[in-house]
Amino acid sequence: DIDKALEFHKKNAPGLIIGVYMVDYALELLDGIYPDRNSYTLNALCETRVCLIDSIQIMTGCTVGNKYLKLNAMKNGRYALILYNRDTSLGYRVYIDLSKIDKEKYPQLYAFFAKTRDYKNAVRKELSKATIEEFYTVERGIFSYQKVKVNVPAKDPLEPAKICEICGESYLFLEKPLNPERDICPYCEQKLLKNEVFEVIS
């Protein structure tokens, strides 16, 4: 699974490898409630928007595209995930427990999650290698878990679509527009404000 995740992620990131172990742990915990993994629909919540997302996607098949992986439900930036049965909403949250990481024995691992790594005096690749090596000595020893009931809709509502009167493209009506009297997509709104994400050059 680590090899698959690394191939998908394209770089040897500590967070990705640690995430693989976290997902594996959460799946094992779920097996205690639901021994047959094919008997229910697995969903996931990710509390951060970095490497852990890819660990979840490659190991569970819960992706942003199929909406089995929820990213917007929680925006707290904690390195944690929840795997749960969509029908019962019951599952497990696995998270990094900093109290279990000895700062003296595993300085790079602690610094990685505390965001205190010294990038000025070391190369990022070297720090990542040291972090991974320290993690492999403790593995699940730095995780804690909680049994949880997830309070989000089992399925996302179908968002209405509109046709932008400026660019002519259809778009999902997700947020309140700046000018509710006109059907203008978010990109064209930002373009009018000269704050667009990209500029068409040809």
Kindly give the residue locations of the regions a language model identified.
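Cys/His-clustered metal-coordination modules, chiefly Zn-binding fingers
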Residues: 114, 120-202
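Long, charged N-terminal interaction/targeting segments
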Residues: 3, 7-152
